[in-house]
From Swiss-Prot:
Keywords: Monooxygenase, Oxidoreductase. The lineage of its organism: Eukaryota, Fungi, Dikarya, Ascomycota, Pezizomycotina. It is an enzyme of class 1 (oxidoreductase). Specifically expressed in conidia. Oxidoreductase; part of the gene cluster that mediates the biosynthesis of trypacidin, a mycotoxin with antiprotozoal activity and that plays a role in the infection process. The pathway begins with the synthesis of atrochrysone thioester by the polyketide synthase (PKS) tpcC. The atrochrysone carboxyl ACP thioesterase tpcB then breaks the thioester bond and releases the atrochrysone carboxylic acid from tpcC. The decarboxylase tpcK converts atrochrysone carboxylic acid to atrochrysone which is further reduced into emodin anthrone. Belongs to the avfA family. One of its GO terms (biological process) is secondary metabolite biosynthetic process. InterPro entries: NAD(P)-bd_dom, NAD(P)-bd_dom_sf. This is Oxidoreductase tpcG. One of its GO terms (molecular function) is monooxygenase activity. It comes from the Eukaryota. The gene is tpcG. It comes from Aspergillus fumigatus (strain ATCC MYA-4609 / CBS 101355 / FGSC A1100 / Af293). Pathway: Secondary metabolite biosynthesis. Pfam families: NAD_binding_10 (PF13460). Signal peptide: none annotated.
């Protein structure tokens, strides 16, 4: 069963590939900008017949079309930990995928399910256990990223008459081992490991009843939290600087992705 992972070199992308390859029947279409980087992160992919790598620009429509062709689900996980001014990663990815799917739809192909990685911070229900002042800080520290995600979500919801999307919204994320997860429509529990997040995204995509289609879906850990992402404080601080003083962005350090971050 083919799955496309757009953003294969990120923490979530590599975790998705690792989880998917646990099944001998899974086929992975891994999209990235840099094949060498992906093979550096996951060297065993070089001779893995379950994986096809598609490297190039997200604006390369023929490339993206072939990447998502015949897929059961497409995971949209291209993002950044940095509060980049005028960030468009999520919206550009969603737009490229929809353009590709329109071509395939015109050919009579069956449509995949889309799974967008978003954030619990954007959802009042899923953020119910987050202190208001903490949520305010998070919203400001990733304001550009969240605006991009909100626009991508709105765009994908406009396609709901012909494409189903699941909006996965975790809380804090950390590079850690897999501990177990639980999908929820009412809460998130974090910090959560990327491996648990990836397993949750696959479970939601594979749900035979479509219970998570067009829903905001939280993820909770089930066997204890992941370790606290040590890069989170610096990520948040630099995000606040970029929010209030965006002209400083070119001079500020990157804060990820390997350190983990808070969504």
């Amino acid at each position: 069963m083919p799955y496309a992972v757009l953003g294969a070199t990120g923490n979530c992308g590599t975790a998705l590939i690792q989880n998917l390859l646990q099944s001998s029947t899974s086929k992975v279409h891994a999209y990235c900008r840099d094949r060498r980087k992906l093979l550096y992160l996951l060297p065993h992919l070089a001779d893995n017949k379950q994986v096809d790598i598609f490297d190039g620009s997200i604006h390369d429509l023929p490339l993206i079309t072939e990447c998502v062709r015949n897929c059961h689900a497409v995971f949209l996980v291209i993002s950044t930990n940095d509060n980049v001014p005028q960030c468009r990663m999520a919206l550009d990815t969603a737009t490229a995928v929809i353009q590709a799917l329109r071509i395939l739809h015109g050919e009579g192909a069956s449509m995949p399910k889309l799974v967008l990685l978003s954030s619990a911070t954007l959802d009042d229900q899923l953020s119910q256990n987050t202190a208001p002042w903490v949520r305010w800080i998070l919203l400001k520290s990733a304001s550009q990223v969240y605006q991009d995600l909100s626009q991508a979500e709105a765009f994908l919801r406009q396609q709901q008459d012909w494409i189903s999307t699941i909006f996965i919204k975790p809380g804090g994320l950390s590079v850690d081992v897999q501990r177990g997860h639980r999908l929820s429509l009412t809460e998130e529990k974090s910090p959560l490991s990327y491996l648990d997040l990836a397993a949750a995204m696959i479970e939601a995509a594979d749900d035979p009843d479509g219970r998570y289609d067009l829903r905001n879906v939280g993820v909770a850990y089930t066997d204890g939290p992941a370790r606290f992402p040590r890069g989170a404080p610096m990520c948040i601080f630099m995000g606040l600087v970029r929010h209030f003083l965006p002209f400083l962005h070119p001079y500020l350090p990157a804060t990820g992705p390997n350190q983990g971050f808070l969504c």
